[in-house]
Regions:
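A helix-centric hydrophobic-segment signal that preferentially recognizes long
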Residues: 2-162
C-alpha cells in the first residue's frame, strides 16, 4: 500500500513540476522577445533622430555631400535589416548588429564634420539633436545589456531543463 501511495504522489507531482518548469521557460522566452522589442525601439528612435540631424547638417554644411550620402545610405541599409522577434537567431542578430555598426561609423564621421562648421556649433536644433542622440546611444546600450542578460538567463533555463 505504501508503494502505491508513493507512486500516486509521484504521478501527481511529476506532471505538476514539469508544467511549472515549462511555464517558466515560456515566460522567459516572452521576456526575451519583449526585451528585443525594446532594443529595436531604441534603434528606431536613433533612426528618426538621424534623419532630422542630416536635414540640419544639409543646410549648414553644403560641401559635405559625401559624408551626408554615407549616413543616408547607412541609415537606409540599417532599416532594411529587420528581425522577427520569434526568430532571434545568432546569425540574424549579427546581421542586424552589423548594419547598426555601419550606421554608427557613418554617424561618427558626421559628428566630426560638425566641428568644421561654426554655424553648426551654435545651431540650437543641431545641439538638441546631438544631445538626444547621445541619450539614445546610452539607451541602446542599456537595452542591449538587458536583452543579453535575459537571453543568457533563458538559455541557462532551457539547457538545465529537467
Amino acid at each position: 500500500m505504501k508503494k502505491f501511495r508513493l507512486f500516486l504522489v509521484m504521478a501527481i507531482l511529476v506532471p505538476f513540476l514539469s508544467s511549472c518548469s515549462y511555464n517558466t521557460m515560456v515566460e522567459k522566452r516572452e521576456a526575451v522577445t519583449g526585451q528585443w522589442a525594446q532594443v529595436e525601439d531604441s534603434y528606431q528612435r536613433r533612426m528618426d533622430l538621424i534623419g532630422n540631424l542630416v536635414e540640419t547638417v544639409k543646410g549648414a554644411a553644403k560641401h559635405e555631400n559625401e559624408t551626408l550620402t554615407a549616413v543616408i545610405n547607412a541609415r537606409a541599409n540599417a532599416t532594411k535589416v529587420t528581425i522577427d522577434p520569434t526568430n532571434l537567431t545568432e546569425d540574424n542578430i549579427k546581421a542586424y548588429q552589423m548594419a547598426q555598426n555601419n550606421l554608427t561609423e557613418a554617424l561618427s564621421k558626421l559628428m566630426v564634420v560638425h566641428e568644421q562648421y561654426p554655424d553648426l556649433k551654435v545651431n540650437q536644433n543641431f545641439l538638441e539633436l546631438q544631445a538626444q542622440l547621445e541619450g539614445t546611444e546610452n539607451r541602446i546600450s542599456v537595452e542591449r545589456k538587458k536583452f543579453n542578460t535575459m537571453a543568457q538567463d533563458y538559455n541557462t533555463t532551457i539547457s538545465t531543463f529537467p
